[in-house]
Amino acid sequence: VGNEINNQYWNYMGDLDVSAYTVKFQRAFRVFYTAMKSVSANDNVMFSIDHYWNMLPEAAPVGKYKGKDILLAFHNYEATEGYMDYGLALHPYPYPMTSPNFWDDDKTGKVNDTMDSPVVNFKNLHVITDFMQMESMRNRKGQVRKIFLTEEGFTSTQGGKDKSIDQAAAVAYSYFIADNNPYITAYLMSRQEDSVDETKNGLAFGLSKIVNNKLVPKRAHEVFKYIDNASATEGTADFARAVIGIDSWDQLIPGFHFPGRE
């Protein structure tokens, strides 16, 4: 319900502080939540925030809030005004979005392993799941609320240079991070094909590009197609280790297992 609600670019309500803005959104969310649960009790109902966790979004000229502040305000109002078993959707894009190599994002000074990290993405995804594991953030049953990665993408170009191999490596590595985190429920890519407008701005997120009005798969397309195939995933992602600069995946992901091989 709503898109990246910590940025009024998508959810305009005027000049409001985070408290006033969130209470209005929470009440609208409750209408949708109640309606959906009334006809399908097992549905997951969630709201999304972008990767700006403990800093204000840098784009858009309208009201902007820290994702962490929005989440806490929503959670507190939910506790006050009536229980909802809401879920959280996160859009963990690289920082900056014009580079696919999220594994180097700590060098920007915006991505770290603390709960006060300015940005949360795949480099430090555990920050959001650690936060949601806190007793104060759990649902009424004491369970960690479901977390969905409902929009992520990695550009295949950077500064006019081809970065399709880096993009493919980013898809493999990010999927492995999500699959090895027991608190992540879903992983959804943002683009099947490149958006013309986004590509002009250096954001070639598609798994395929368009050439002469036809889809041409990138390397990332093959990776995404086979990444959760237990018999193919290891070979499909083998190239990515050299791109990232590691010998084995457990150097980066403690207790690593390939998808389907638990």
Residue ranges and their predicted role:
Residues 19-161:
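Noncatalytic carbohydrate-binding groove/subsite architecture in carbohydrate-active enzymes
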Residues 3-7, 52-53:
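Aromatic-lined carbohydrate-binding surfaces of glycoside hydrolases
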